[in-house]
């Protein structure tokens, strides 16, 4: 999937205001609804053979290109709840281009669910001929708007569009990385399976509410699942996620709380890149707070070959793909504004048992492709014909929600040091460093089956922190590296981990 097209297609121009003429309830009959119904539907669906979703569209919409799809725009004045002075509005996406799967969407009000009917006059079609009024195409997805930046303007805060992908932003941010409902066989030789959301139920918010609830039904060849998202936009936009998975077959590679991002190049990885920009990425590292209480930082890179990393754990406390660089000078891109992309932190609720945080880094020669994936992989397979429940919280925002007293690695620079060595230059910042004794501060660096030399720590007046540098003698095979700042044998920084590849 072309990533730039995906972003543009799900972020068409937005218009505010309170004009009348919003989406009408049409003729669908309401039915009783509560949170248990979606799980029952998913359970029943899993007991039946998988049926591929409908991609049938009218001939003039079946094979449109990106430009024609982008011209199909939802009319903002027809938004759900427009003119009702509620804290949220919903707009819908037309099917076509990459997004051919039919998605049904319901509004839930007073314990009753009413299907939101497809109506051609909800959209403008550019040069395309609209479908006839009797055609029921359903939708491709939806987005939610709220006055997150200004009290009188409903900005887009999240979008559900394409397979089981969804994205969100916090105040002042732009779309970047994506989350997914479920990943199956990601990075496996047998090929990845892409589950998809087939039905949504959106609860009508009360006046003055600071959250909105969305229920979702997911289907796939190997499993079904039910979700309840409680979405709270703000300085950090938070999703409370309750999910139940119903496998049709034993799932030995089910990725939980999966996310995807893009890392093209940065100061640690500029091989074969000729670009005026210092860095191009939506995320620059994977942060892990493991069950042992360790805080890990793994800078991302764009490898020559697929790289898979595993961080084994018991009951993880959190992990996420982060965008730590927040300065325009780090990117110098007036159009993309990578410094305004959100970080995404997963906070497991309850014990998730044994497993691993997985990181996949996929080679890419263009920034339009998502080439980074991360998720939690349970150690034990999820057996078929059972229910497997998980609860977690997604934090979309500038940083992790967990306060830390440890110093952090803010930048990783890598370069050649002669013909036989590679130099690593790590900048470390944080309040912890302001009270250190320089005579007792040292860098602790280890390498698996390789030699490290010239470990140096020194103040960095430009950042107010410290700089740790070292040299790795070149090897023929990949080398796993680990570094931290120590004082009196106590770690005062998080743990930096990295895989160097020849």
Roles of regions detected by a PLM:
Residues 1-14:
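N-terminal secretory signal peptides and thylakoid transit peptides that target proteins
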Residues 29-66, 73-75, 93, 330-502:
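Terminal accessory/anchoring regions of large secretory-pathway or extracellular enzymes
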Residues 50-188:
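Solvent-exposed N-terminal domain segments of exported/luminal and surface proteins
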Residues 67, 159-161, 252, 256-387, ...:
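A contiguous, surface-exposed recognition patch within enzymatic or periplasmic domains that forms
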Residues 176-232, 353-358, 369:
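Extended, loop-rich substrate-binding clefts of extracytoplasmic carbohydrate-active enzymes
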Residues 216-265:
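Acidic, contiguous internal or C-terminal segments within carbohydrate-active enzymes
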């Amino acid at each position: 999937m072309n990533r730039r097209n995906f972003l543009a297609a799900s972020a068409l121009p937005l218009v505010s205001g309170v004009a009348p003429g919003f989406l009408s309830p049409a003729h669908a009959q309401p039915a009783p609804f509560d949170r248990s119904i979606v799980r029952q539907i998913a359970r029943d669906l899993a007991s039946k053979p998988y049926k591929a979703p409908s991609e049938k569209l009218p001939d003039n919409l079946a094979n449109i290109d990106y430009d024609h799809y982008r011209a199909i725009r939802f009319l903002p004045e027809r938004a759900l709840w427009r003119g009702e002075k509620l804290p949220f509005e919903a707009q819908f996406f037309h099917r076509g281009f990459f997004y051919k799967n039919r998605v049904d969407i319901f509004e839930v009000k007073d314990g009753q669910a009413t299907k939101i009917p497809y109506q051609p006059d909800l959209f403008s079609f550019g040069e395309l001929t609209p479908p006839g009024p009797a055609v029921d195409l359903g939708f491709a997805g939806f987005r939610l708007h709220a006055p997150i930046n200004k009290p009188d303007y409903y900005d887009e805060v999240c979008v559900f569009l394409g397979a089981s992908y969804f994205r969100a932003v916090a105040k002042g941010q732009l779309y970047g990385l994506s989350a997914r409902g479920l990943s199956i066989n990601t990075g496996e030789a047998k090929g990845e399976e892409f589950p998809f959301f087939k039905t949504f139920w959106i609860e009508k918010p009360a006046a003055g509410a600071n959250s909105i609830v969305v229920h979702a039904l997911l289907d796939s060849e190997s499993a079904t699942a039910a979700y309840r998202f409680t979405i709270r936009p703000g300085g950090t936009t938070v999703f409370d996620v309750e999910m139940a998975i119903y496998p049709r077959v034993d799932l030995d590679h089910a990725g939980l709380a999966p996310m995807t991002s893009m890392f093209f190049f940065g100061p640690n990885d500029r091989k074969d890149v000729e670009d005026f920009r210092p860095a191009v990425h939506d995320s620059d590292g994977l942060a892990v707070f493991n069950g042992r209480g360790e805080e890990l930082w793994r800078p991302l890179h764009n490898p020559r070959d697929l790289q898979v990393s595993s961080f084994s754990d018991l009951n993880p406390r959190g992990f996420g793909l982060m965008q730590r660089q927040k300065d325009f000078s780090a990117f110098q891109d007036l159009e993309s504004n990578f410094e305004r992309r959100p970080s995404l932190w997963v906070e497991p609720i309850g014990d998730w048992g044994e497993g691993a945080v997985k990181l996949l880094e996929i080679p890419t020669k263009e920034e339009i492709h998502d080439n980074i994936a991360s998720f939690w992989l349970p150690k034990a397979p999820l057996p078929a014909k059972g229910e497997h429940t998980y609860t977690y919280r997604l934090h979309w925002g500038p940083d992790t929600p967990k306060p830390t007293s440890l110093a952090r690695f803010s930048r990783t620079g890598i370069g050649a040091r002669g013909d036989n060595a590679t130099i690593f230059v790590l900048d470390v910042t944080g309040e912890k460093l302001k009270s250190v004794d320089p005579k007792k501060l040292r860098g602790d660096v280890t390498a698996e089956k390789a030699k490290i030399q010239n470990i140096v720590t020194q103040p960095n007046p430009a950042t107010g922190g410290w700089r740790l540098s070292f040299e790795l003698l070149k090897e023929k095979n990949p080398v796993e590296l680990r570094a931290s700042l120590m004082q009196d044998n106590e770690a005062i920084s998080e743990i930096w981990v990295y895989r160097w590849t020849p």
